[in-house]
Amino acid sequence: MAFEQTISVQESLRRIHELQPELNAAVTIVDDAPEAGIPVILKDNISTKGIRTTASSRILDNYVPVYDATIVTKLKHAGFTPVVKASMDELGMGGTNRNAATGPVHNAWDQDRIAGGSSGGSAVLTARAAAPL
């Protein structure tokens, strides 16, 4: 499957910052991301070298991996640029994305509903076109 550059890294970062107060979907926004590449949203439990990775948990609040997960290496080689670590259920344990450490992730279209799932942050950012993937 081929992806086209539908949004720039800078535009993606702008959208994420714009949506964050409404959605609470980002744990770490990668403001110093390289400008080249197709923006990609990563769940906050995927190791990213040099980028804070907390699994949306206070116990990992300051953890910065020294290596990339295999999927991150493959995405980078394919031309993708990580722009955000998205909120999730703490340590991937749950299905609501109502997280005590990072706060609840709000539904992309209805603030009276939950985002749901362990990957709620990724889901709502994708639904609101913060990045193509």
Residue ranges and their predicted role:
Residues M1-V64, D68-A69, L91-M93:
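Short, well-ordered alpha-helical
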Residues T73-L133:
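Short glycine/serine-rich loop segments
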